[in-house]
Amino acid sequence: MKKIMKEKHVVPDEVLTKEFLSQFKTEADVSKFLKQLHAQVLEKMLEGEMDAHLGYEKHSVSGNNSGNSRNGSYPKKIQTEHGEAVIPIPRDRNGQFEPIVVPKHESRGLSIEKLVISLYAKGMSVSDIEEEMREIYEIELSTSAISIITNKVHQAAQEWQNRPLDPVYLIVWMDGIVFKVRDNGKIINKTVYLCVGLKQNGLKEVLGMWVGKSESSAFWMGVLTDLKARGVQDILITCTDNLNGFTDTIRTVFPQSSTQICVVHQIRNSCKYVVYKDKKEFTADMKNIYNAPNKEVAAAELDNLEKKWGGKYPYAILSWRNNWDDLTVFFQFPLEIRKIIYTTNLIENLNGKIRKYTKSKLSFPSDDAVKKMVYLSLMEIEKKWTMPITNWGLIMNQFMLIFENRIQI
């Protein structure tokens, strides 16, 4: 992508004098100079980022009593086209500064294209990026050029969505996140449905995203069929909300899979029928059900709940009765596995992180725009998914004992 620089960034011929050029005796001299120049440019760009982060320039009186200030810098080695260089990375006193042009945990500065995509991933519009590039980095890029760059994200998202998947996942959590999207001239709610799988090495992986107007078992049938077409042969445990018909849909595509309905969703659903003054006590009584040591004790606690509250809130109890078998699947497993399957907290936490990246967007112009933004958010989030889940060694041994014929080591 060719960038258009401001006129003042073009090196005039009068600067390239014989006197200036005489300092370079070898190609190594030129390379050393360019490395130093590259480092100085990055340093200036980082200073511009810090100015924008704090809202005032260095040594400005505007920073007095602002609540945050510069706090020196730390040296960082980076790789340039001309070799390794050390540049100072500025810090702020509150520890909130996140450099963009030289990202944390990376040893290379971003290219212009990657810089634009990084800004786009943070929820900035094309016009916002154009202004940011001009004011902070002093780089002139037209909005059309920025659009061309961000449109490449759509192709990358499609390739990611269609990539092959592992044949077996130990657990797959399923949930959705709602966005405002323009559709036929109207702003409506649409849901991006996500599946997160637990791999046989203990790492989490987002398997895909699907956009729909409303959740239904027929919709999820399409999602599960897509997973199978991309290579998934077996899912040991699925964790879902209590959508009517969802469990049967899963069994149609993955007949051996055990499905656990999210207990937290069930608690919220029951509490809808309970008046505010009783909710605290009612919720405490419900905890006795899912904190029970086994299914038999849990059933007795449900009976106790019904004796105490059934006359006043029959519908709050009825939903437990109607979904009992799918709500209590987790009792079949050891405690370490129970903790990660009886709720969809893992994927709800993921949704919360996506919200942080998309909070500046009140609505999206199209489904594709939503997909691009969520895809970029997921790529940023997955960078931190580098370690197996807690107690992984113990959990894997438990899975191998319980599902020894279905796990391929």
Residue ranges and their predicted role:
Residues P255, N288-I409:
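Acidic/histidine-rich catalytic cores and adjacent linkers
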Residues P90-R93, I100-E106, I139, T143, ...:
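RNase H-like nuclease fold core
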Residues G67-K122, E138-I148, P167:
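Basic, short loop/linker segments at the boundary and entry of helix-turn-helix/winged-helix-like folds
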